Amino acid sequence: METIALNNLTIGYHHNCIAAHLQATLSAGTLTCLLGSNGMGKSTLLNTMSGALPPLGGTVDIAGKSIAAYSAKALAKQMSIVLTRPITVQQLCVNELVALGRYPYTDHWGRLTSHDETIVMESLSLVGMQAFSQRKVGTLSDGERQKVMIAKALAQQTPIILLDEPTAFLDFPSKIDMLKLLKHLAH
């Protein structure tokens, strides 16, 4: 079982500390929710845990190894992340965007195998977006784009998925479906 550990982690931007001395251990097979008021550092913590933002102190470890010691490709096989930032690849088709989650597993040229393409379609199916596979990302609603980004994380097939507001932009029935899917995937 993969675990992610925060060891005396201090997060923030440049020299502006948001939270210090964080300690936590999360195991695979668990669904953990981080709650807090707006502006309290939840997204900063997720960005730091993913390696997108360097810690101001301490470490984030996966399976006992600091994420700083992983190559980008090796880390992408351990952890995927869905953030709340707007998607800037409006001209890609949905299946092309989700296929980006498979690139840690592709060859030097980034070619997808038929197995990769199957995983992309299965991931889209899990979030109810398979019928949208050929649509341009720029034509999707905010909720549809959120589902596509979650499908991309699922296609990455990592033991750890970090989700920043995973039900943002989703209508109420889709929120319920997404939470059921996440619970199922965690167990």
Give, region by region, the residue ranges found by the protein language model.
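Helix-to-loop junction immediately C-terminal to a conserved catalytic motif
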Residues: 50
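Conserved ABC transporter NBD signature motif
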Residues: 58-66, 75
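The feature captures the beta-strand-to-loop junction immediately N-terminal to the Walker
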Residues: 35-37
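Catalytic Walker B motif of ABC-type/P-loop ATPase nucleotide-binding domains
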Residues: 161-165, 170
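Conserved ABC ATPase "signature" region
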Residues: 99, 114-132, 157
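Conserved ABC ATPase signature
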Residues: 111, 136-140, 144
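Conserved structural motif at the start of ABC-family nucleotide-binding domains
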Residues: 4-6, 19-21
